[in-house]
Amino acid sequence: MAAALAVRRAGSAPAFGPEALTPDWENREVSTGTTIMAVQFNGGVVLGADSRTTTGSYIANRVTDKLTPIHDHIFCCRSGSAADTQAVADAVTYQLGFHSIELNEPPLVHTAASLFKEMCYRYREDLMAGIIIAGWDPQEGGQVYSVPMGGMMVRQSFAIGGSGSSYIYGYVDATYREGMTKDECLQFTANALALAMERDGSSGGVIRLAAIQESGVERQVLLGDQIPKFTIATLPPP
């Protein structure tokens, strides 16, 4: 029973009484404490994310889709507060749709990233949202932009984010190389996400992947037995 009760910090709540017996997830917001990733290759981008959504220590959803379409060839990966990131993504999708209608042409990936940056910076005191924007457009081809909490925007060859990213910085820095093919980027992303899911308690579930090129979007889901295995505990018996 003790394991199911919230651990109360000094001064934050009574140590005894009914309030002390409240599970921590009843007082926490739903969070996509997560691992997200995007990689640029010649001709497009690959995005990936785990699927676990938590409320404190409680797993609220095991199969969340954190790869959100913003336009036909533009997606974002969401980390942080589920409510905040959904609201920001919906607002940007709405604005980008109008922008595309006014110009009578597909929007640029940089435009979508700039909209995310403006909103995340303007409401930086109220939002808990870390976003990776990736997609393809006729002017620049495949592009990856990172908008971490606070509203900064930077273009990168690859980007990782979420609570699980701290476990895989060494792996992605050592493994990434320029000129990777789409299939190599898909495997690279799947391996990185699997490693993060092994170590991060807020990441888990299935792995969702998306490859965006001029021809369109290809999506796939890696279920439990398809997720790459690395640690001894998860390797099959000899």
Curated annotation (Swiss-Prot):
Catalytic reaction annotation: Cleavage of peptide bonds with very broad specificity
Propeptide: 2-33
E.C. no: 3.4.25.1
Residues with Phosphothreonine modification: 68
Keyword Mitochondrion attached: no
Pfam family, one: Proteasome
Residue positions of the active site: 34 (nucleophile)
GO biological process, one term: proteolysis involved in protein catabolic process
Described function: Component of the 20S core proteasome complex involved in the proteolytic degradation of most intracellular proteins. This complex plays numerous essential roles within the cell by associating with different regulatory particles. Associated with two 19S regulatory particles, forms the 26S proteasome and thus participates in the ATP-dependent degradation of ubiquitinated proteins.
PANTHER family according to UniProt: METALLOPROTEASE TLDD (PTHR32194), PROTEASOME SUBUNIT BETA (PTHR32194:SF14)
Family: Belongs to the peptidase T1B family.
Subunit composition and interactions: The 26S proteasome consists of a 20S proteasome core and two 19S regulatory subunits. The 20S proteasome core is a barrel-shaped complex made of 28 subunits that are arranged in four stacked rings. The two outer rings are each formed by seven alpha subunits, and the two inner rings are formed by seven beta subunits. The proteolytic activity is exerted by three beta-subunits PSMB5, PSMB6 and PSMB7.
Name of the protein described by the UniProt record: Proteasome subunit beta type-6
Source species of the chain: Mus musculus (Mouse)
Gene symbol of the encoding locus: Psmb6
